[in-house]
Curated annotation (Swiss-Prot):
Subcellular localization, as worded in the UniProt entry: Cytoplasm
Organism, as annotated: Rhizobium johnstonii (strain DSM 114642 / LMG 32736 / 3841) (Rhizobium leguminosarum bv. viciae)
A GO BP annotation: protein modification process
Additional free-text comment from the UniProt record: In the reaction, the free carboxyl group of octanoic acid is attached via an amide linkage to the epsilon-amino group of a specific lysine residue of lipoyl domains of lipoate-dependent enzymes.
Protein name as catalogued: Octanoyltransferase
EC number assigned by the record: 2.3.1.181
Lowers pKa of active site Cys, annotated site positions: K164
One CC-aspect GO term: cytoplasm
Length: 239
């Protein structure tokens, strides 16, 4: 596996007796307001002892602003709808061809460590990419998952170009996580041009198809579930 540290370091396996995580797909493109309402409802149920949930969706084109978003990074404010959200991070784009995984887990049943949870989400993406022979990497100073682009010109400081392939942004309530990750499968990468993604202008954005992999969303979903189970444990529900 590429860039994996010890399993113990990123393990977020549940306590004995914890029920499997529900794995659910949304039909069609989900409006962002509907997604937030669903997460709010599910988080309340989970905090009250309900089963945890991973909800896989695609959105219509939109931008979201995290709690650290700088208004200057919204380059084209009228291009798509913009939603303020309570997740961490800055501006990001969501749209068709991007797999968004809303991860709603009770860390009291696992490990009450926010940094470890974020690292575990990165690990899920890295494992997913590894199954498709793509080397994803994490950076200590940049949340998300990155791929090196040796075919591109070097950066101004002489280092190799890198593009972001997956973004992360989370929120917690009573130690229950929500929001989650977005993995670029085949979105319109031009749509990222309306923002400075995650407030980082020195690096670009890529997708699996942009890297030359003619994959379908269903192919990615299978690998994503396998990777998730390796890090977070058993799931149940739709195949």
């Amino acid at each position: 596996m590429a860039m994996l540290r010890t399993d113990l370091e990123f393990s977020m396996l549940p306590q004995l007796g914890t029920r499997p995580v529900r794995w659910r797909f949304a039909d069609g493109l989900v409006p962002y307001e509907e997604a937030v309402e669903t997460m709010e409802r599910e988080v309340a149920l989970i905090a009250d002892g309900g089963d945890e949930l991973v909800w896989l969706v695609e959105h219509p084109p939109l931008y979201t602003a995290g709690t650290s978003a700088n208004a200057r990074d919204l380059v084209q404010p009228n291009r798509f709808p913009v939603f303020a959200t309570g997740r961490g991070g800055e501006y990001t784009y969501h749209g068709p061809g991007q797999r968004v995984a809303y991860v709603m887990l009770d860390l009291k049943r696992r490990r009450q460590d926010v940094r470890a949870f974020v690292a575990a989400l990165e690990d899920v993406v890295i494992r997913t990419l590894d199954m498709m022979n793509v080397r994803g990497e994490r950076r200590e100073d940049r949340v998300g998952v990155w791929v090196r682009r040796p075919e591109k010109p070097l950066l101004a400081d002489g280092t190799m170009a890198e593009d972001k392939i997956a973004a992360l942004g989370i929120r917690l309530r009573k130690w229950v996580t929500f929001h989650g990750l977005s993995l670029n499968v085949d979105p319109d990468l031009d749509h990222f041009g309306g923002i400075v993604p995650c407030g980082i202008s020195a690096y670009g954005v890529t997708s699996l198809v942009d890297l030359g992999l003619p994959v379908m969303m269903a192919d990615v979903d299978i690998r994503l579930r396998t990777a998730f189970e390796a890090v977070f444990g058993e799931t149940t529900g739709e195949i």
